[in-house]
Amino acid sequence: MAKMRVYEYAKAINVSSKDIIAALKDMNIEVNNHMAMIEENAIKQLDQKFKKSAKPAGNKKDAGTGGQKPQQEAAKLNAGSKPNKNRDGKKNNVQNTQFNNKNKKKNNNNKKNKRGKNHQSPQEKQFKPKKELPEKIEFTNSMSVGALAEELGKEPSEIIKKLMLLGIMATINQDLDKDTVELIASEYGVEVEEVIVHEETEFEKYEEPDNEEDLEIRPPVVTIMGHVDHGKTTLLDSIRKTKVVEGEAGGITQHIGAYQIEENGKKITFLDTPGHAAFTTMRARGAEVTDITILVVAADDGVMPQTVEAINHAKAAEVPIIVAVNKIDKPTANPDRVMQELTEHGLVPEAWGGETIFVPLSALSGEGIDELIEMILLVSEVEELKANPNRRAKGTVIEAELDKGKGSVATLLVQNGTLHVGDPIVVGNTFGRVRAMVNDVGRRVKSAGPSTPVEITGLNEVPNAGDQFLVFKDEKTARSVGEARATKQLEEQRSDKAKLSLDDLFEQIKQGDVKEINLVVKADVQGSVEALAAALQKIEVEGVRVKIIHTGVGAITESDIILASASNAIVIGFNVRPDGNAKSTAEAENVDIRLHRIIYKVIDEIEAAMKGMLDPEYEEKVIGMVEVRQTFKVSKIGTIAGGYVTEGTITRDSGIRLIRDGVVIFEGEVDVLKRFKDDVKEVSQGYECGITIKKYNDIREGDMIEAYVMQEIERK
């Protein structure tokens, strides 16, 4: 009997690779993964083990577990009863404390707990100091001075004194931000843990927890990535042609951005996404869609820039990579070179002692496709991909568009649960009821389980690719959550557009022909306010004007920040500081505060920002001329011009024009600039140099190269 790989032996005796690996480890035989080789003597031992356990194992197990399970459970209950009491007691205490704190906060803020006059006042009951300091306190969105005092077991007056020493004037009911709470807590050596509270609009609030026993194995979701022209599309088409069409007789294949194939009763979902941009966009929106990445590398071309980019994307998403070495049927194919180059990027082939699976194939002829699919199934088995089909569906949008006949159409990938026709659904910031579902071969279906791509209609608007979706119990809840999410997004967009700072004035959107900066000016005395306002309004920059919407004497207050936020303004403070509330509000509202002590520095800063706000004007300046005296043709580089600088200088980052007989025949950029064998940044008049022009090779002796730069005209 010859040696066999783990997965081959597992396949032969119809047992999973994981069971074989576990059995080998029990026999003290070390194996790393399903691709490891098994020696002959080990195969014999495995044969004996699995043949012996084939029939009687089930009966023994049943007999054993049948009698023992109730006893074990009873023992566990008896053993764990005492500690659980203590734990439950502690939990109840913590919950009671938190509940009391919440009630007390509500009483302090006079918002919700208006139950009557018989209650004791908060000051009488709330602030009984505790003896011991806690190790850790929890912080949600904010915490009042009184609540912080109670958490720390201190008198509120003590906390207020400490805040005064930090320059923060606060009352007992005033809310503190996280930084301030951490500062005060650190004074007592107490840690602050931030607790994230899910809002009504967040899907996490409506998530159903899955029990381990409800989870079932689901098909893997595979994305194919790689460099342009390395055969991604051909590979997808080849898999679709050999597996989808033959398996779906009479089915009309339509493009919905994803499709499924079936091999030996097991399904695989392929995402037909347009390259890395869509992959990255989905990840940026929090959509971890892909389970396995197929990295396509052409055997005749090797690793290219987009290949490296694809590797980095897959690694950042922590997704296993299978390398498909394509175009092996070409005469110039060199798979070993591909392996060598990928090793430099951390993808070491199994044949060389690594963990990355390499599959040589030809997408054009179909050679190696079956082996690739087998490897995908093996990796998915090792990854243990599971989902619960008996719950309300959740997943991700793959594609979405507005169809003239159907309205809003979205391709969804169900990641957990089962989606049914008629389900009330929220998709991103849109909502609706699933009116119709079409699978990847154009057939109408009534339900779709985990890892299944379907095209649905029935949404009120078009969602974005990468948006999450969740099915709700009723249409009323779905509508309210969908509308709330849409409103929240609109507010965020307005907030993002409205907030102006001096740093990002260059990127601000033009509002008609007039551009203006709104300012709120605060100073220590009225004279300074008037002088500063007058000086700012005298700034004369073409096309931009200063609009002072509010002036005042004294510290920058919360009302100043709210006004600035509503008016898209920048706050200027002269010899004054913002108070604690103003700081926290400015951070929350993203309002830019600029503090100065010298008037001319305020003027200079605003003037510079206003100049940057204008569209820059440029003029061309010729910096040098080069005469081409000789040309050299080099393979893989192109034509090198041996030149002599007749005027000025030529630099590596300058623009160039190639002039022949007084006519400009090409305008572009310098690719390489050398003096002898060294790369140089510039070459001056009277020196020789070697030049290559980016994406242009028709250079002849006698040509003139004119070097120029674009200079920004300074506004006056």
Curated annotation (Swiss-Prot):
GO molecular function term, any single one? GTPase activity
Keyword vocabulary terms for this entry: Cytoplasm, GTP-binding, Initiation factor, Nucleotide-binding, Protein biosynthesis
List ligand-binding residues for GTP: 226-233, 272-276, 326-329
Residue ranges of region G4?
326-329
Major subcellular site: cytoplasm
Q: Where in the cell is it found?
A: Cytoplasm
Segments of skewed composition (Basic residues): 102-118
Q: tr-type G domain: which residues?
A: 217-386
Region labeled G1 — which residues? Answer: 226-233
Quote the biased-composition stretches of kind Basic and acidic residues, using this chain's numbering. 125-137
The family classification in the record reads: Belongs to the TRAFAC class translation factor GTPase superfamily. Classic translation factor GTPase family. IF-2 subfamily.
Query: Where in this protein does the record put region G3?
Result: 272-275
Q: What does this protein do?
A: One of the essential components for the initiation of protein synthesis. Protects formylmethionyl-tRNA from spontaneous hydrolysis and promotes its binding to the 30S ribosomal subunits. Also involved in the hydrolysis of GTP during the formation of the 70S ribosomal complex.
Give the compositionally biased regions (Low complexity): 92-101
Q: Where is this region: G5?
A: 362-364
Question: GO cellular-component terms in the record?
Answer: cytosol
Q: What is this protein called?
A: Translation initiation factor IF-2
Q: Which cysteines are joined by disulfide bonds?
A: none
From the UniProt entry, list the residue stretches annotated as the region Disordered: 50-137
Species name: Bacillus licheniformis (strain ATCC 14580 / DSM 13 / JCM 2505 / CCUG 7422 / NBRC 12200 / NCIMB 9375 / NCTC 10341 / NRRL NRS-1264 / Gibson 46)
Query: Segment G2: which positions?
Result: 251-255
